[in-house]
Amino acid sequence: MDGESWYAKDRPPGDRVWRHLQYESYIVNEILPRLPEPPLAAGASFGALHSVLLAARHPTRISGYIALSGAFDTSKWLNGYHDDNVFYTNLVEFLPGLNDEAYLGPMRAQNPKVIATGADDPNVEDSRRVAGLLQSKGIQVGLDIWPGWAHDWPYWKDMMRRYLS
């Protein structure tokens, strides 16, 4: 999906964000209603973004998240383009101003709340930043920085095994 949205450099930035929102809408309106209970959202890299973004934008619909090596600052892929859709799909932009207890209360109740990355991962600062923003809202998210671990599937497989066990 990210190849049709965030990574689609041949498309105008506004179209990329809109495509992401279509994907999110599909999950929220077509998949989640068919589940017996709110699921755990988990993913790596852009999947980590999707996990935490769903948990923040739809906190009563997601039970918790495990986000590995997240690329959380979506502005990097939009060439300076900005509108309301960009704002509300960029965790580093909208979390600082989020003060609505209708969102924050359910976000605090989510379990687990894990953001993990490797010390050598190119997105380590994004992970630190988003975890700090969540913690500043009273959301007890675990931030794990794995020594020497980088941005790759073998590492994520080991990480996910640990967090799911």
Name the predicted role of every residue range.
Residues 1-165:
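Non-catalytic cap/lid and distal C-terminal segments of serine-dependent acyl enzymes
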